[in-house]
A protein has these predicted regions:
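Extended hydrophobic packing segments that form well-structured cores
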Residues: 365-410
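Glycine-rich, charged/polar anion/phosphate-binding loops
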Residues: 140-141, 203, 212-214, 245-248, ...
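Active-site bordering "gate/hinge" segments
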Residues: 1-258
Length: 410
């Protein structure tokens, strides 16, 4: 699938090297062992990066397991065609043994995002899309358990396409310049640069954890939201799980979220675009929602089990992020710096890695729920870049401003 611009081979080679060498590590910075099996999933629109990823995996002493996914192209919209012709039992089908075998086999997972058509599923009923997502939950559970046990490293990165650039109001070359800048690909050694950035955000996360924050109150023209955190939470940051990533995040106690937030960034999900989103929470549950576009998809997401509760609260310091405008892709939009950084929350599944302690592997979902860690097949990051202040209430009852005007203040 030919694009109007393809980055030079030297740059793609450097990008692939960054994805493998920096992306394949856990949140503690431990690198994946040589000889590991790395699965890399690449859409057809990103074929040039597939070539260099395979090479980088081999050069670093690992075993590549590539998955090449057809991109929607004119009459050959494979994704939409599945939903058009699949019966309910086919939408609900999951090849459990096959998926479990894949997860058991791999030590690392790389996913490349490259939309040939951000609206590929616009004609498909949202309910059917969510039905499919729900049916795949067992496969996600296999993967999640392996990640939580520290036995599976994963990362996500972006390959620019004409369709994505158009959606963001740029030429493809301009779009790629944003990727290059955000990932520091013009640096002599991007891996070294990212190791330095990672140390900075990890230090911020550790400081927040040491504060023993009980709750945060987010206030601004578009938000008045209080989220319970609790003493059994830690804050995490960066790592190689997303490239790029400047965010610092935790999992709130889903039962203790109250207030309102308007999200000024569009939300791209399931081949559709939600705009003008507003959410109202009472005792941890979304009790009211609005959207100026595709509200029916938002409603379907909220009706998915656990989809109406929060699994993540995140902040990005504007001083670190090189992303200055919307890229029409959540991976980048949740890391926007700009003038005021960004706040994003995630509807759906929590990060159990944010538990501050050593979890018992026998703990069931119900026990995690009792600890305030939400469970869901969805994890939908929704984003605001407007000016806001975040005030924390600490264990001793005192308050402290931890984030203001786009900067951490701790």
């Amino acid at each position: 699938m030919k694009q109007s611009y393809t980055p030079p081979a030297t740059l793609l080679e450097k990008y692939a090297d960054l994805i493998v060498r920096f992306g394949m590590q856990n949140k503690d910075g431990k690198k994946i062992k040589k000889g590991s099996v790395i699965q890399f999933t690449v859409p057809e629109a990103a074929k040039p990066l597939y070539f260099y990823l395979q090479r980088a995996i081999l050069k670093n002493g690992h075993h590549p397991m590539g998955i090449f996914v057809p991109s929607p192209d004119g009459q050959y919209n494979v994704q939409a065609d599945f939903y058009t012709h699949a019966a309910k039992k086919q939408v609900d089908f999951i090849a459990k043994k096959f998926i479990k075998g894949q997860v058991d086999q791999i030590d690392g997972s790389i996913q490349i995002l490259a939309e040939a058509d951000p609206h590929a599923l616009k004609s498909i009923e949202s309910k059917k899309i969510m039905q499919r997502a729900q049916s795949q939950n067992p496969g996600l559970s296999y993967r999640r358990r392996k990640i939580e046990s520290g036995k599976l490293d994963w990362t996500i990165a972006l390959y620019g396409t004409d369709a994505m650039a158009k959606e963001a109001g740029m030429t493809l070359k301009e779009y790629w310049q944003q990727i290059i800048k955000a990932c520091y690909l013009n640096d002599k050694d991007p891996v070294a640069t990212w190791n330095t950035i990672n140390k900075t955000v990890q230090t911020t996360a550790k400081k927040l954890t040491k504060l023993r924050i009980q709750s945060v109150h987010v206030v601004g023209s578009d938000v008045d939201l209080t989220l319970g955190i609790g003493s059994n939470r830690k804050w995490l940051a960066g790592g190689g799980c997303n490239i790029p990533s400047y965010e610092v995040f935790t999992t709130p106690n889903w039962t203790d979220v109250n207030g309102w937030i308007r999200l000024n960034q569009p939300h791209y999900r399931y081949g559709k675009k939600i705009e003008g989103m507003e959410l109202w929470f009472e005792s941890g549950v979304v009790v009211k929602s609005k959207a100026s576009k595709n509200h029916e998809l938002l409603e379907s997401m909220l009706k998915t089990p656990g989809g109406n509760k929060l699994g993540e609260f995140s902040l990005t310091d504007a001083r670190l992020s090189k992303i200055t405008k919307s890229m029409a892709e959540i991976l980048y939009d949740e890391n926007i710096g700009g003038t005021y950084g960004n706040t994003h929350i995630a509807l759906g599944s929590a990060y159990r890695e944010c538990y501050d302690g050593t979890p018992d592997p026998t703990w069931k979902t119900a026990y995690w729920e009792a600890l305030g860690f939400n469970s869901s097949v969805v994890h939908s990051d929704v984003i605001s870049t407007t000016k806001r202040t975040v005030t924390a209430t600490l264990e001793n009852g005192t308050t402290k401003v931890i984030y203001k005007d786009g900067h951490f203040s701790i």
